[in-house]
């Protein structure tokens, strides 16, 4: 669970409501027609701009921001270091029994190719190709969210224009002025809210998680190729530690790279 995402989501909403309460306008913030125009309209436009599977699946992707992005870099470095030691002692074929212990298919596939005697350049090409396809998928989802964020204020302005038209058309009916004015103003608020409070932050968080995963997989590629090349375990460790945070790097240096 990513506590920061929950703090950002609910804390931001609470601040908005608290400010509205202090300003005496909290009751006017909820307006169903404006909500339908802004949120519903901008979301349904995604069905026009993206395939059905993406428009429907966007909420599943949004849910990922509430799960902590942990790619187990420390464990991967430790285990690849141990495999490098074992391969130097007993040969690459001895790694076969260790492969299935990895939960990550990306790591397993790379190590399987090493054990099978696949050329290093071929292994690198295969793993980088898989990484590229993953990046393409992730970038499509992030692009979808950015599109939604861009659409929401536009629908907010559309609702504002609709409200103004209704207000101008019924100026003689004083009883409808308040409702039409509310629609005119609140849709702009909803458009800005959807964009700045929710969709754009979610897209940014997913981009951050994506960058972490790419870096993690690049580290795996480096480690697998180092094992395939028969590098000394210390050399492998020094290469992989460059991908880690300074704190984690220092801890693993003390553990793996000994005098």
Curated annotation (Swiss-Prot):
GO cellular component: plasma membrane
GO annotation (BP), single: proton transmembrane transport
Entries under Pfam families matching the protein: MotA_ExbB
Keyword Ion transport carried by entry: yes
Keyword Ion transport among UniProt keywords: yes
Compartment(s): Cell inner membrane
Protein's membrane topology: Multi-pass membrane protein
InterPro entries: Flag_MotA_CS (IPR000540), MotA-like (IPR047055), MotA_ExbB_proton_chnl (IPR002898)
Domain of life: Bacteria
Record topological domains on the Cytoplasmic side: 205-259
Keyword line: Cell inner membrane, Cell membrane, Chemotaxis, Flagellar rotation, Hydrogen ion transport, Ion transport, Membrane, Transmembrane, Transmembrane helix, Transport
Assembly with partners or alone: Each stator complex is composed of 4 MotA and 2 MotB subunits. 2 A subunits and 1 B subunit are thought to form a single ion channel, so that each stator complex contains two channels.
Family the entry assigns: Belongs to the MotA family.
Function according to Swiss-Prot or TrEMBL: MotA and MotB comprise the stator element of the flagellar motor complex. Required for rotation of the flagellar motor. Probable transmembrane proton channel.
Protein name, entry field: Motility protein A
Organism ancestry: Bacteria, Pseudomonadati, Spirochaetota, Spirochaetia, Spirochaetales
The encoding gene: motA
């Amino acid at each position: 669970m990513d506590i920061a995402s929950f703090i950002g989501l609910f804390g931001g909403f609470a601040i908005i409501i608290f400010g509205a309460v202090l300003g005496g306008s909290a009751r006017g913030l909820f307006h169903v027609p404006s909500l339908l125009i802004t949120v519903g309209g901008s979301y349904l436009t995604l069905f026009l701009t993206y395939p059905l599977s993406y428009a429907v699946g966007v909420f599943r992707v949004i849910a990922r921001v509430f799960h902590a992005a942990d790619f187990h870099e420390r464990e991967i470095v430790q285990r690849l270091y141990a495999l490098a030691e074992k391969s130097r002692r007993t040969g690459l074929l001895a790694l076969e029994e260790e492969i299935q212990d990895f939960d990550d298919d990306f790591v397993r596939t790379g190590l399987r190719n090493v054990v099978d005697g696949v050329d290093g350049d071929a292994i690198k090409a295969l793993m980088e190709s898989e990484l590229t396809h993953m990046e393409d998928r992730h970038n499509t989802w992030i692009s979808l969210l950015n599109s939604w964020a861009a659409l929401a204020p536009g629908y907010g302005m559309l609702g504002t224009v609709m409200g103004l038209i209704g207000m101008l058309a019924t100026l003689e009916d004083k009883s409808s002025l308040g409702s039409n004015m509310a629609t005119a103003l609140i849709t702009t608020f909803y458009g800005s809210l959807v964009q700045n409070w929710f969709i754009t932050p979610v897209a940014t968080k997913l981009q951050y998680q994506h960058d972490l995963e790419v870096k993690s997989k690049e580290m795996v590629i480096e480690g697998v190729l180092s094992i395939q090349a028969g590098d000394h375990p210390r050399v492998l460790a020094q290469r992989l530690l460059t991908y880690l945070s300074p704190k984690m790097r220092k801890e693993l240096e003390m553990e793996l790279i000994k005098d």
